[in-house]
Structures are given as structure tokens and as C-alpha cells.
Amino acid sequence: MKGLLQRVRGARVEVAGDIVGAVDQGLLVLVAVEPEDTRASADKLLHKLLNYRVFSDAEGKMNLSLADVQGGLLLVSQFTLAADTKSGLRPSFSTAAPPALGEELFDYLVVKAQQLHGKVASGRFGADMQVHLVNDGPVTFLLQT
């Protein structure tokens, strides 16, 4: 499972012009599920997302986690993040999980995040989404389980 984490001052996701998820200060995470992923993979990614220290402390060092700053977490499914881009000029998506598994594990990740962290929003799995964000830094990390 991959999570492309971006520290944001604010972010929202829209489907057909309607806002379906939004956060203020926090993290926007684009999530890709791969064929070998399990609920344990989702649990591991979520632990990292909530505890990865990407926010500045009083001394300006990246020493605080999302949980520490009580920031928002916006989860957006993005199967293209799992693409194989090693050869040719067209991405292959054979390295992405089948849609049923992707949806099951993405939904599981969202529910677990809501149980463990107060401020969680998400996009809509499989929808054509428009994501708006104000990057903070920018600070971006690719997390993999």
C-alpha cells in the first residue's frame, strides 16, 4: 500500500462540483492499494500517517505528528499511484489492486482512521474527483508498507 502524504494548510475534494471531503491544516494523502495488500497493510500505513513527524515544533524542526497538532486527514484513493512506469511511454496498471480489493481496503482505512483520529475526511472511491490543496512547505513523502 502506498500513501503520498502532503502537508497542507487546507485541502478539499469535489465530485461533480460537490465538496465530499475537506480539511484545514493537516495532511492530504493519496492512497494506492496493491494486489498483495491486506488490512494489516492499511493498519501499518495509518499508524505512519498519524505518527509521522512532518509538522514543525517551536524550534522549526519537523518533530510533530498529525496527532500532535490535531490536524485534519483527507484520504483520497488514487490507483494511478500504483502504476508501473519502468518501461515504455504508457503506464501499466497491472501493479494496482483489482477494484473490489482496492475499495475494500480503502474503505477499511477510512473507517479505522475515523475511529483513531477525530478529523478525517475522504474522497469517493472510483469517482472522477477534483482535488484542491494549499501545500505547506511543500512537504511531500511517499510512504509504503
Swiss-Prot record:
Give the EC number(s) listed in the UniProt record.
3.1.1.96
- Motif Gly-cisPro motif, important for rejection of L-amino acids covers 137-138
Q: What class of enzyme is it?
A: hydrolase
Q: Where in the cell is it found?
A: Cytoplasm
> What GO CC terms are in its UniProt record?
cytoplasm
Which domain of life does this protein belong to? Answer: Bacteria
Q: Which keywords does this Swiss-Prot/TrEMBL entry list?
A: Cytoplasm, Hydrolase, RNA-binding, tRNA-binding
**A single GO BP:** D-amino acid catabolic process
Task: Spell out the reaction equation it catalyses.
Answer: glycyl-tRNA(Ala) + H2O = tRNA(Ala) + glycine + H(+); a D-aminoacyl-tRNA + H2O = a tRNA + a D-alpha-amino acid + H(+)
MF-aspect GO terms: D-tyrosyl-tRNA(Tyr) deacylase activity; Gly-tRNA(Ala) deacylase activity; Ser(Gly)-tRNA(Ala) hydrolase activity; tRNA binding
The record's listing under InterPro entries reads: Daa-tRNA_deacyls_DTD, DTD-like_sf
Role summary: An aminoacyl-tRNA editing enzyme that deacylates mischarged D-aminoacyl-tRNAs. Also deacylates mischarged glycyl-tRNA(Ala), protecting cells against glycine mischarging by AlaRS. Acts via tRNA-based rather than protein-based catalysis; rejects L-amino acids rather than detecting D-amino acids in the active site. By recycling D-aminoacyl-tRNA to D-amino acids and free tRNA molecules, this enzyme counteracts the toxicity associated with the formation of D-aminoacyl-tRNA entities in vivo and helps enforce protein L-homochirality.
Concerning its family, UniProt says: Belongs to the DTD family.
About its domains, the entry says: A Gly-cisPro motif from one monomer fits into the active site of the other monomer to allow specific chiral rejection of L-amino acids.
How does the record describe its quaternary structure? Answer: Homodimer.
The molecule here is called D-aminoacyl-tRNA deacylase
Species of provenance: Pseudomonas fluorescens (strain ATCC BAA-477 / NRRL B-23932 / Pf-5)
Name the lineage. Bacteria, Pseudomonadati, Pseudomonadota, Gammaproteobacteria, Pseudomonadales
